[in-house]
């Protein structure tokens, strides 16, 4: 556990959501929402995640038990710094997966924001990956919806040249403290049209997420998950150190966070 804490201090994150005056936890577990921060403001949100799944895929979760810590920060109204490090077991090895992104967002009208940025990840397979993300989100007083397209460039010749990942999240506030959402994640979407896709085919995850964040409190609890489906199958498979399960799976994830 102490090793986890030490290594997690350098971690880099994937997710973030901010309110108008301070960094706030996202009601989503798998999706990124562009922030709506105030000019010249800076704030951060730290969190701890615990997840369990079988036949999972990154970035949804590590296989079996995964722990993670992270920080999500905003600087002004446009800049987002995301940091997360996860710890999971691959075979008999305990491995660390740091991820990080820098995103820049802009307003389009009164309720829509778009974002784009770049980042880096080291997967549990010990493959270095360069990231690019494009996102759009719409937030109102009672609801929010956002979508992301991620391009991942593995720095390994044993993988696809570029992996396509999408995330979609839609939430509705129930009272002042609870947000109920539906999230979906798709990985290796090139498997739908590329017969030579090398990472086992496209995989999809979809399910509910519930977030509890009392207005007067600085903490939030989020729980969610869903089934993982093999949408396509590829006759090609790389020899990279990466799990390519042949069956469907599932993932459950929880997060506890604090604003400061």
How would you describe each model-predicted region?
Residues 4, 14, 27-31:
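Detector for intrinsically disordered, low-structure N-terminal pre-sequences
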Residues 127, 156-165, 199-201:
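Active-site glycine- and acidic-residue-rich loops that bind
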Residues 1-11:
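Bacterial N-terminal signal peptides that target proteins for export
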Residues 23-124, 130-132, 137-147, 152, ...:
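Transmembrane beta-barrel domains of Gram-negative outer membranes and organellar outer membranes
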Residues 9-19:
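Bacterial N-terminal signal peptides
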Residues 167, 171:
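Pocket-lining segment of extracytoplasmic ligand-binding domains
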């Amino acid at each position: 556990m102490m090793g986890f804490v030490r290594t997690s201090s350098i971690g880099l994150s994937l997710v973030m959501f901010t309110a108008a005056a301070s960094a706030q936890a996202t009601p989503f577990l798998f999706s990124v929402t562009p922030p709506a921060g105030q000019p010249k403001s800076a704030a951060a949100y730290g969190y701890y995640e615990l997840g369990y799944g079988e036949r999972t895929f990154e970035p949804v979760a590590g296989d079996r038990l995964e722990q993670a810590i992270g920080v999500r920060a905003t600087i002004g109204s446009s800049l987002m710094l995301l940091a997360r490090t996860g710890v999971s077991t691959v075979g008999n090895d305990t491995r660390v997966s740091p991820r990080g992104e820098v995103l820049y967002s802009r307003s389009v009208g009164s309720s829509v924001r778009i974002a784009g940025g770049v980042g880096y990840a080291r997967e549990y397979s010990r493959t270095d990956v360069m990231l690019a993300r494009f996102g759009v989100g719409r937030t109102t007083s009672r609801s929010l919806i956002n979508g992301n397209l991620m391009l991942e460039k593995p720095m390994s010749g044993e993988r696809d040249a570029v992996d396509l990942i999408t995330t979609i999240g839609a939430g509705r506030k129930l009272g002042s403290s609870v947000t109920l959402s539906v999230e979906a994640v798709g990985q290796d979407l090139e498997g739908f049209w590329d017969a030579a896709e090398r990472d086992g085919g496209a995989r999809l995850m979809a399910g509910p997420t519930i977030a509890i964040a009392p207005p007067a409190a600085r903490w939030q609890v989020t729980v969610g998950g869903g089934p993982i489906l093999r949408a396509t199958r590829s006759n090609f498979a790389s020899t990279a150190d990466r799990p390519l399960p042949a069956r469907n799976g599932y993932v459950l994830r929880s997060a506890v966070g604090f604003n400061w």
